[in-house]
Curated annotation (Swiss-Prot):
Residues 1-20 form the signal peptide. Pectinolytic enzymes consist of four classes of enzymes: pectin lyase, polygalacturonase, pectin methylesterase and rhamnogalacturonase. Degrades the rhamnogalacturonan I (RG-I) backbone of pectin. This is Probable rhamnogalacturonate lyase A. It catalyses: Endotype eliminative cleavage of L-alpha-rhamnopyranosyl-(1->4)-alpha-D-galactopyranosyluronic acid bonds of rhamnogalacturonan I domains in ramified hairy regions of pectin leaving L-rhamnopyranose at the reducing end and 4-deoxy-4,5-unsaturated D-galactopyranosyluronic acid at the non-reducing end. It is found in: Secreted. SUPFAM superfamilies: Galactose mutarotase-like, Galactose-binding domain-like, Starch-binding domain-like. Belongs to the polysaccharide lyase 4 family. PANTHER family: RHAMNOGALACTURONATE LYASE-RELATED. It comes from Aspergillus niger (strain ATCC MYA-4892 / CBS 513.88 / FGSC A1513). Keywords: Carbohydrate metabolism, Cell wall biogenesis/degradation, Disulfide bond, Lyase, Polysaccharide degradation, Secreted, Signal. It comes from the Eukaryota.
Length: 531
């Protein structure tokens, strides 16, 4: 329900282009912030809860009337203040363990935000959610209807739905952090985008992904997930998350190049200015140049990353001082790790080199890129459930080395769906010695891991992988710890001529269909030992 203050804001801006002065109107229960932007932006913040209860952009109310926009699931109660200093307005919402900042610059249709925490919120995740009017803003960008679950029938938990014959979920809106600088919801006359300026205190690394948007019918949600337990590989980081910016425009999509260095002058807890940071520059070398190369730095307090140039040169983002683990990826596969120390006000030189060593291979299925790219259904898995009718048949399948296509091998093997997968290959007489079957995976669920049988020889059962306690493949995730399993194949097991390998899923757990124990593939290699 719109408050009296919200209704007055709406009426006063009905013309859409008439702006009052930049400033704050203080009411008994709210602050009304006028950005004085050309396409007017006026929003209302509840003084008791920190909820945004009204957002009027160009004369139209964008905020959902039933529930506010806020950090987490709402702070409940907070100490809320609003101050104006020159060209900036800052709203500060404080609890014992969290401070939420909202900053507006005179003339800009942007709500800049940052979130400072000393403890993880009790709900177990840290997010900002804007609940916006789905009648005015029905669309989601850039992936469209894959996360529009309005009028859907739940088919898995409370977050995967069937809509008009298609499986959809809010998780299918995700994008890798390294590639996600902007995601939006939009309508014919308005667009609202989340611009992500800083991931340093988030968790998961460059290839982590999380929910970005979800039109659930009553309202369209625009998110920024700073951390969560959604296939999470790291501990949560405390401190300042952000800045991140909610940008309001009409037909145009805003640039991601937003300067938020003014935060240094606004007494934002935990903010580290450019002058207090350093960089790392160098050259990466050795990996397969057919893949993107990424360099990643992390410690308990911060994380950063960058793509290298085609020649391997790189410069990091501006980093907080400290000692970092430095990782070099071929695609998403780790080929080297090192350590580097960053000092404020200086650039550190640090090269890194690494490659994938596999020995003399008899065959290889897939690539050492840390992803299931190219395997059957990999092209659809990010945006739909494995049960979707648009998916190709999962099998069980047989892959014949030399004649099958990569799409004849499934991107995931499920204990109750398509286990085992069969591989057939032909060996020459000089390929019958001792060998290693190396199975590269990206993610497991419910303890699922591979057990291989080569002709009549059954490889040993590997120990259970680390349990992430999170659904993965059914929610559009594929990246976990990237476990690699080596199966020692005794001399004479491989015979001259035709050979057969079966790969089965083993686990002490069970489940139905696509929630049965499973693992996702990256590469299968059989290589001769010391040949």
């Amino acid at each position: 329900m719109l408050s009296k203050t919200s209704l007055l804001s709406l009426l006063s801006l009905a013309a859409g282009v008439v702006n009052a002065d930049f400033g704050i109107t203080t009411n008994d229960d709210s602050y009304v912030i006028n950005a004085n932007s050309p396409n007017s932006l006026v929003f209302t913040v509840d003084r008791g809860s920190c909820d945004i209860t009204s957002i009027v952009h160009y004369g139209t109310e964008l905020q959902y009337s039933g529930k506010g926009s806020h950090i987490g699931s709402g702070l409940g109660t907070a100490t809320v203040s609003a101050t104006k200093s020159g060209d900036y307005i800052k709203v500060t919402c404080e609890t014992d363990t969290l401070t939420q900042y909202m900053v507006v610059h005179d003339g800009d249709p942007i709500i800049h935000m940052a979130t400072y925490i000393t403890e993880e919120p009790s709900i177990g995740e840290l997010r900002f959610i804007a609940r916006l009017n789905s009648d005015v803003l029905p669309n989601e960008e850039p992936f469209g209807d894959v996360s529009n679950t309005a009028d859907g029938e739940a088919i898995e938990g409370s977050d995967v739905f069937l809509v008009d014959g298609e499986t959809r979920s809010k998780f299918y809106s995700s994008q890798r952090f390294i590639d996600d600088q902007r995601h939006c919801i939009a309508g014919d006359e308005h667009r609202v985008c989340m611009i992500l300026n800083q991931y340093e205190t988030s968790s998961g690394g460059p290839f982590h992904r999380d929910i970005n948007s979800n039109n659930g019918g009553d309202y369209n949600s625009l998110y920024w997930y700073m951390n969560s337990g959604h296939v999470q590989l790291e501990s949560y980081r405390m401190g300042l998350h952000g800045p991140y910016s909610m940008y309001f425009s009409r037909s145009g999509t805003p640039s991601t190049d937003i300067d938020t260095s003014f935060f240094a002058d606004l007494d934002i807890e935990g903010y580290v200015a450019e002058s207090g940071r350093g960089t790392v520059s160098g050259t990466a070398s050795g990996a397969d140049s057919s893949f993107d190369w990424v360099v990643h730095w992390y410690n308990d307090d911060a994380q950063y990353w960058t793509y290298t140039s085609s020649s391997g040169s790189f410069t990091s983002p501006a980093m907080k001082p400290g000692t970092y683990t430095m990782v070099y990826y071929q695609g998403e596969y780790v080929v080297a790790t090192s350590e580097v120390t960053v000092s404020a006000g200086s650039s550190t030189s640090k090269d890194i080199s690494g490659s994938v060593e596999t020995g003399t291979t008899i065959f290889k299925i897939g690539d050492w890129d840390g992803q299931p790219t190219g395997f059957r259904n990999a092209e659809n898995q990010l945006r739909m459930h494995p049960s979707d009718s648009r998916m190709s048949d999962w099998g069980p399948l047989t892959y014949t080395v030399g004649s099958s296509s990569l799409t004849d091998f499934p991107m995931a093997i499920f204990k109750s769906v398509n286990s085992p997968v069969t591989i057939k290959f032909t060996a020459t007489s000089d390929q019958t010695g001792a060998a290693t079957l190396r199975i590269g995976t990206t993610l497991s669920f419910a303890g699922g891991r591979p057990q291989a049988t080569i002709n009549d020889y059954e490889g040993s059962a590997p120990s259970a992988p680390t349990n992430l306690d999170s659904r993965g493949v059914t929610r559009g995730a594929y990246r976990g710890y990237g476990d690699v399993y080596d199966v020692s194949v005794p001399e004479g097991t491989i015979v001259e001529g035709e050979n057969t390998i079966t790969i089965s899923v083993i686990s002490g757990s069970s489940g139905d269909d696509f929630l049965s124990p499973n693992f996702l593939d990256a590469v299968f290699i059989i290589a001769l030992v010391d040949n």
